Amino acid sequence: MQEGGLPRAKKRFGQNFLVQPQIVERIVAAIRPASGDHLVEIGPGPGALTKSLLRLLPQFTVVELDRDMIAGLRALAPPEQLRVLQADALEVDFAALAGAGNALRIVGNLPYNVATPLIFHILEHAEQVRDMHFMLQKEVVDRVVAMPGSKAYGRLSVMIQAYCAVESLFTVAPGNFFPVPKVDSAFMRLIPHRPGLLPPHLQAPFARIVATSFAQRRKTLANNLRGILSADDLRGLQIDPGSRAETLDQAAFFRLAEATVEQGNRS
C-alpha cells in the first residue's frame, strides 16, 4: 500500500488512480446510471467510482486486469450486486457480456497506452453498446472529437466518428490522480449511431481508405491514393485531388470507400 491507503500503482498497467471525490461525482452525474442499466466498468482499480456506482445500481460488472485489485473489489459488495471479472478488457467478448439483456453502458478510467485499441475493440460490438463514458488523455479526446480542418483531425477522428456521436464533457487536471500524470485528462461520451452509418460490407474498405488517406499527412490525396483511385476518380466524387485528408468530412470518406468497392467489383 502507498500513501492514502491506495494500492501501489503499476507502470506496466498504466495506472493513475482517480482520488478526487468531486470528479467522481461529476462522472456519475454525466453517466446518470439507473436501475436496469447493464453497466460495465473497465479498470476500476481500488474502486473510487465503483463505490459510488454501488450506491445507485442493484448490480453491475467490473473488469480489472490487475490481480492485486481483485480481493479489494470483491470486498466492496456481494457477488450478486458486483460481478468482478479478472480479465484484460482487450480480450473480453462484450457481445457475450451483453447477452440477451439491455445494451451495455461502459465506463472507465482507461490507461493511456490501451485506450485507442480498447475503444476499437468495443466498437466491434457497437450494436450491443448503448453508450461509453471514458476518462482519457486529453490529447486523445481532442483528436477523437476534432472536426475537418483542425490540427487534431485525423484517422482517429474519422474512424470513431463513423461509429459514434462523440462529445468531450470536461477536462481533469493531473492533480486529481495518484500517481500524478504528466498530462491533462478529459472525460468523454461516445454513443454508437443507431442505425449504424457503415453497412458491414463497407467497414473494411472504409478503414483501409482512411488509413491510406492519412498515411502521409503532408501529401495530397492524389499522391496518397495513387494506384487506388485516380485524380479523375476523385473529381468524379466531388473531391479535389490536390486536397489533403484532414480537409475531408465523413461523407467524403464514405464516397471514397464506396468507390473502391465499386472498382473492385468491376475488376
Curated annotation (Swiss-Prot):
What InterPro entries does the record tag this protein with? KsgA/Erm, rRNA_Ade_diMease-like_C, rRNA_Ade_Mease_Trfase_CS, rRNA_Ade_methylase_Trfase_N, rRNA_adenine_dimethylase, SAM-dependent_MTases_sf
Localization per Swiss-Prot or TrEMBL: Cytoplasm
Provide the reaction this enzyme catalyses: adenosine(1518)/adenosine(1519) in 16S rRNA + 4 S-adenosyl-L-methionine = N(6)-dimethyladenosine(1518)/N(6)-dimethyladenosine(1519) in 16S rRNA + 4 S-adenosyl-L-homocysteine + 4 H(+)
Instruction: Give the EC number(s) listed in the UniProt record.
Output: 2.1.1.182
Report the Pfam families cross-referenced here.
RrnaAD (PF00398)
Sequence positions that bind S-adenosyl-L-methionine: N16, L18, G43, E64, D88, N109
Q: What broad class describes the main subcellular location of this protein? A: cytoplasm
Does the entry feature the keyword Zinc, yes or no? Answer: no
Top-level EC class, please?
Answer: transferase
Q: Which Gene3D superfamilies match?
A: Ribosomal RNA adenine dimethylase-like, domain 2, Vaccinia Virus protein VP39
The yes or no answer to whether the keyword Signal is present is: no
GO annotation, cellular component aspect: cytosol
- Any one GO molecular function term: 16S rRNA (adenine(1518)-N(6)/adenine(1519)-N(6))-dimethyltransferase activity
* Keyword list, A-Z: Cytoplasm, Methyltransferase, RNA-binding, rRNA processing, S-adenosyl-L-methionine, Transferase
Q: Which PANTHER family match?
A: DIMETHYLADENOSINE TRANSFERASE, DIMETHYLADENOSINE TRANSFERASE-RELATED
Q: Which family does it belong to?
A: Belongs to the class I-like SAM-binding methyltransferase superfamily. rRNA adenine N(6)-methyltransferase family. RsmA subfamily.
Query: What does this protein do, in the record's words?
Result: Specifically dimethylates two adjacent adenosines (A1518 and A1519) in the loop of a conserved hairpin near the 3'-end of 16S rRNA in the 30S particle. May play a critical role in biogenesis of 30S subunits.
Record protein name field: Ribosomal RNA small subunit methyltransferase A
